[in-house]
């Protein structure tokens, strides 16, 4: 699902995150609304801190059994680990099955299994029941994001094209990802540069633009993008990865090694990082 990074820049979110993290350090209990807890789960997940996200999900469920947000996160993790049975169990543990996020999760289960005929049937039936214009736009955006997340880009593009607001920034970002997937890097870069001009403080934009430059073997520009991203959020794993890969491309193997090691500290047991570290060590030997 598409996550709005701007949420994490709000002062109320920062206060909640600080209160939770301080409570965890001291062993105290902190109470907050389940929606606020779900935002913290999303933040950790978005930031690549999966263990922290899991810990928050467990804590949230200890206070709010059956709450949708933590179960959605756990189900998506199960899908990522190819454990569809566990994902289905998490889905069915949700109390409020009328919530739109429950529908999205059921749809995602079908998409993850490439049951596109079933997912399309579910989506079309649900879309017919939506009357409010804003709700329709949000639905189309979320469905488009689901398909793009699973590289079903043609289906994702089809639903995104139904949106009335073609200039919606989240829609444009998804379109840029679709273009990247098709190796249409120039058009993807133009979209991202426009988004950055409007809001240069979204580190995800810089990471995606850096990835485009990496695909073009333009490692200088890739590094510039990574450094902008890390100036906004020093510990974001996509930015760290982008910087390390750019350094490899520039021949700065010692710097790349240190950067991959920093990545591995945040994402322990990451096989791809261990491979990159091994490659750097071989080159330095």
How would you name each of these model-derived features?
Residues 46, 80, 112, 146-149, ...:
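Register position in tetratricopeptide repeats
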Residues 60, 91-94, 126-129, 159-163, ...:
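Canonical positions in the second alpha-helix
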Residues 65, 97-99, 131-134, 166-168, ...:
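Short coil turns that delineate tetratricopeptide repeat
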Residues 70, 102, 135-139, 171, ...:
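TPR alpha-solenoid repeat register
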